[in-house]
């Protein structure tokens, strides 16, 4: 064996010596997540992000984060089968300002509606709102027994299914095309679109459990801070406020300037 120094020993410390454990949470900050004014509950929770270090800015890590919240939590309600997706668009101080990003029905609600002896009718359509958001809406409805019907089954004919699907597409297009995103969300909260479809299709074949089951955000217009501030600032949500955080105005940034109006 060659005589020489043992390199492992001269490097210092034993092999496999424990490193100093640093708590990862000591480098992180909590931010409040603020929902738009159309919802009753404004403060929906908190989110973690690593503090600003060098070129890595904390607010950049928050922008684009998507939160999925039950409508019952947003409206302080009992009915909880709708889930809203909300995306962080801007950070003001310790507040994440979020906007609508999509909607879905819960899995258990969808499964509870699908049954034997009835026809399931589905439709989908891509529609653009007046303020430039491109949405894909999915609708679902089920046939039901007519009054005094003895027969067990209530199947619609293929021609009737096509007529109902056409009506679904017409109503969804009309309701979205003529409104901006805020008004569309206000219609999705109580699902007035589904009720309109159910009413319009009674003459073709009686329906029940008609819902806009899913909304996808396909395209967004260029981000404008003024429009986001309008969603969060002026005007509370529909219904009575509940809690201190309800309908509270979000502080505006120091450098914020209102958008220039084309006509007075």
UniProtKB/Swiss-Prot annotation:
InterPro entries: Ribosomal_eS1, Ribosomal_eS1_CS, Ribosomal_eS1_euk. It is found in: Cytoplasm; Nucleus; Nucleus, Nucleolus. It holds the Pfam family Ribosomal_S3Ae. Residues 242-255 have a biased composition (Basic and acidic residues). Component of the small ribosomal subunit. Mature ribosomes consist of a small (40S) and a large (60S) subunit. The 40S subunit contains about 33 different proteins and 1 molecule of RNA (18S). The 60S subunit contains about 49 different proteins and 3 molecules of RNA (28S, 5.8S and 5S). Part of the small subunit (SSU) processome, composed of more than 70 proteins and the RNA chaperone small nucleolar RNA (snoRNA) U3. Component of the small ribosomal subunit. The ribosome is a large ribonucleoprotein complex responsible for the synthesis of proteins in the cell. Part of the small subunit (SSU) processome, first precursor of the small eukaryotic ribosomal subunit. During the assembly of the SSU processome in the nucleolus, many ribosome biogenesis factors, an RNA chaperone and ribosomal proteins associate with the nascent pre-rRNA and work in concert to generate RNA folding, modifications, rearrangements and cleavage as well as targeted degradation of pre-ribosomal RNA by the RNA exosome. This is Small ribosomal subunit protein eS1. It comes from Ophiophagus hannah. The lineage of its organism: Eukaryota, Metazoa, Chordata, Craniata, Vertebrata. The gene is RPS3A.
């Amino acid at each position: 064996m060659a005589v020489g120094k043992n390199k492992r020993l001269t490097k210092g410390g034993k092999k496999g010596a424990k490193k100093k454990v640093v708590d990862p949470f000591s480098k992180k900050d909590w931010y409040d997540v603020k929902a738009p004014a159309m919802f009753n509950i404004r403060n929906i929770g908190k989110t973690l992000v690593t503090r600003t270090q060098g070129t890595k800015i904390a607010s950049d890590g928050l922008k684009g984060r998507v939160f999925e919240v039950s409508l019952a939590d947003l409206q302080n309600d009992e009915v909880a089968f709708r889930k809203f997706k909300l995306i962080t668009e801007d950070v003001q101080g310790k507040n994440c300002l979020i906007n609508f990003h999509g909607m879905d029905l819960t899995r258990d609600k969808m499964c509870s509606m699908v049954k034997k002896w009835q026809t399931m009718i589905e439709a989908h359509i891509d529609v653009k709102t007046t303020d430039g958001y491109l949405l894909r809406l999915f609708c679902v409805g089920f046939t039901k027994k007519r009054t005094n019907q003895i027969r067990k089954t209530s199947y619609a004919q293929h021609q009737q299914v096509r007529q109902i699907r056409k009506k679904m597409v017409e109503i969804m297009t009309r309701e979205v095309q003529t409104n901006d995103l805020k008004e569309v969300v206000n219609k999705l909260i109580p699902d007035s679109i589904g009720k309109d479809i159910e009413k319009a299709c009674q003459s073709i074949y009686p329906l029940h459990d008609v819902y806009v089951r899913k909304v996808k955000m396909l395209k967004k217009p260029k981000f404008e801070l003024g429009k986001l501030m309008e969603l969060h600032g002026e005007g509370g949500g529909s219904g009575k406020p509940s809690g201190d955080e309800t309908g509270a105005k979000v502080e505006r940034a120091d450098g914020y300037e209102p958008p220039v109006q084309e006509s007075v």
